[in-house]
Amino acid sequence: MSDIAITISLLALVAVIGLWIGHWKIRGVGLGIGGVLFGGIIVAHFTNQYGLKLDAHTLHFVQEFGLILFVYTIGIQVGPGFFSSLRKSGLKLNAFAILIILLGSIAVVLVHKIADVPLDIALGIYSGAVTNTPALGAGQQILAELGVPQTTVTMGVSYAMAYPFGICGILLAMWLIRLFFNVKVDDEAARFNAESSQDKESLHNISLKVTNQNLDGLTLIQIPGFSDEEVVCSRLKRDDMEIVPKASTEIRTNDILQLVGDDNSLAKMRLIIGHEVDAPTVAYSGEIRSERVVVTNEKVLGKKIRALGIHQKYGVVISRLNRAGIELVPTGNTTLQFGDVLHMVGRSDVLNQAISVIGNAQQKLLQVQMLPVFIGIGLGVLVGSIPFYIPGFPVALKLGLAGGPLVVALILARIGTIGKLYWFMPPSANLALREIGIVLFLAVVGLKSGGSFFDTLVNGSGLEWMGYGIFITFVPLIIVGTIARLYGKLNYLTICGLLAGSMTDPPALAFANEIKEDNGAAALSYATVYPLVMFLRIMSPQLLAVLLWAA
């Protein structure tokens, strides 16, 4: 067999063993996807003994491509809610993440000064303890420029010693915070869903009887509130007749209007129109029905609802719009994106025609448009390769192959649609690509660090380095995690994502996601802090090297 064939076969073996190890649980807690790393260490130990040669270029490619796949799909998943989360809680989350980095940097200074650990080894331990490979590369480059010899070897070995237990330190911190605060995961997930409006309707229906005499004879659009497009009138009942009103429909006293909107807007309309009645709000007569319709027609992507003329042509009202789990009041200026769910109300004989304009092709929701995937990955790699020059630093800083694809994916997922290209990815496809990516990445890291792992552990300073690594990993996490829970009042699942993001650690995020698989709290907080943290993690070893070298 060729070296490449042997390498691929061993990667598959590592994945099988690692995923099996990941399913082991002690008191309900297991390594999860992190087991692949230890599977790689075990396999690497035996391949080193038997002298099997692995292709270095193949390993390097698989590691980087796996990482790119993982962070890109994470960005696509959380992109629609990332920017709104940044406005609501981003400052607090990033402040906690910066505190973790600051405490970790102080720990490195203590290890170097008090324990008298050489600078190159201290920075290698730091990079492994915070599970950040770009930090390792940045530290090696600046130490080489400062004239420190053999940094690649010494930093690489110390990094390998600290990395596996760096992951364990994060998982241990999550577990201890859960035990210490007696966290009930289901309650935390329900609280997150309630706060993010994922498990409750942000819009409501009410039926108002027109008792304001001043409204008699006015058209619907002339009534204050409708012109602001904060409320939608989905139907009008007059005596025994029920219709879907248009903007030009005249309103009469004693008409009953069914309105859709948020609580504040509906309260204003109650003051303007009249009192609320107990008319049915969900049952529709035989002539009028409602449907939930998914936007799948490529011809309407990126277009405003007003431009489609749905209401003018068919007399159909779009009363609600659900995008990425968030319900909105649609207006004429709302731009449609692939996967938007519209609540449409109209006469049975014309509603199907209006639905055909929107699409509602369920099979399209199961398909992955591959062209946008590779456009996004390509743009992400380019962005990650752009150097940022900061005065006083001899080495240019970069987002790298992890940060670049993540930032681009967040932006593209937020944009949603460009022409006929859409960055919607079915959840099952997203999960499959994400799992494949993280398994490939961890398998290679395990194979690379496992060759000298046991020898350094038994005969060298491995245990000492591990101890320093656990100190650098665990102490900042447990301190900030406790503060975030006690004083920041953060959701436990959000804290788990924060801890994983502050260490730029995909395996820890995978573990956090597995705590409550159907909840996006951890992934959202991870993505909220990741871009800034990645930049600071790359910059911090360079800053530490300059400061400690000068001292």
Curated annotation (Swiss-Prot):
It is a multi-pass membrane protein. It is found in: Cell membrane. GO terms for biological process: potassium ion transport. Keywords: Cell membrane, Membrane, Repeat, Transmembrane, Transmembrane helix, Transport. The keyword Membrane applies. HAMAP family: YidE. The chain crosses the membrane at residues 4-24, 28-48, 65-85, 95-115, 157-177, 370-390, 402-424, 438-458, 463-483, 492-512, 529-549. GO terms for cellular component: plasma membrane. This is Putative transport protein HI_0035. Belongs to the AAE transporter (TC 2.A.81) family. YidE subfamily. InterPro entries: AAE_transporter, RCK_C, RCK_C_sf, Transpt_YidE_put, YidE_YbjL. Residues 191-275, 277-360 form the RCK C-terminal domain. GO terms for molecular function: monoatomic cation transmembrane transporter activity. It comes from the Bacteria. Disulfide bonds: none annotated.
